[in-house]
C-alpha cells in the first residue's frame, strides 16, 4: 500500500520521516512532498501509484484522479470537499473523507 501526502499538510519533514519509518514497519510506503504544487501534471506524477492521497485544498479534478489507477481514498487534512471531483469519486468507488483531526494526530 502507498500513502502519498501531495503537499506539506502542516507537518514537518522530520515528522514525515518518522511516519515513513513507522509505516514501513507495516509494509506501507509513505511518500511526503514538502512543497505545494498545483500543476496538474505534477499532481498526476505524485499521485500515480497512490492507494491513499492526503491533501489540504489543492483542487483534484476527474482528469487528475483518472490518472491514479490504484486510488481508493482521498483524505482531506482540513474541512471541506468542494475542491474534489466527488462525482468522479462516486463513479469510481473512491472514498473521500475530511479529517479536521488529521493535523493534530500527525503533528502531536
What does each model-found stretch correspond to?
Residues 1-50:
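N-terminal glycine-/charge-rich "phosphate-binding" loop or analogous flexible N-terminal tail
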Residues 51-108:
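Phosphate/diphosphate ligand-binding glycine-rich loop within oxidoreductases
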